[in-house]
Amino acid sequence: MEYIGIIIVAIFVNNVVLAQFLGICPFLGVSKKVDTAIGMGAAVTFVLTIATLVTFLLQKGILEPFGLQYLQTITFILVIASLVQMVEIVLKKVSPPLYQVLGVFLPLITTNCVILGVAILVIQKDYTLVSSMVYAVSTAVGFALALIIFSTIREQLALTRVPKAMQGVPIALITAGILAMAFMGFSGIDQVF
């Protein structure tokens, strides 16, 4: 039951983008096409899951036992950067079109505050290894879900007549706000778990 609660809260109630406002740059930058959003969601899911596992093990196995918690942020950033490089190499070989579409946003996963934020939150919440992995995967799914829904709406907005003053970023921000309000409808459900 604890894990179900973590999943529901991470995906819907405390969605990392729509409630905690982490990862806004890729959320706005890669959300013009659904295909790109799916690719970015998959890349973030992979990096976030592996980064959380590695950073958790480093924190509990090296940093805490040796009193090196002050190296937490730099260690986590190095782990994330290494994983992003690995994803970039794999995507370049496996799916060159997706690699081209993601463009500059793929290396930006390194500085995506979602990845670092989740790695730090897992430590702050004092989750176990299993709970931290459930939280990481759920957070990544929540990010991908919000990104895919938002990109679907933006594709539809591209086909409609939007007043000139509202085209581009203004209508995207208004849409993101409405989407965030829709996700607020899930607040309170976390009390069940």
Language model regions located:
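Generic transmembrane alpha-helix signature in multi-pass membrane proteins
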Residues: F21-G29, E88-K93, V104-L106, C113-D126
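Ordered, amphipathic secondary-structure segments that act as subunit-interaction surfaces
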Residues: K60-G103
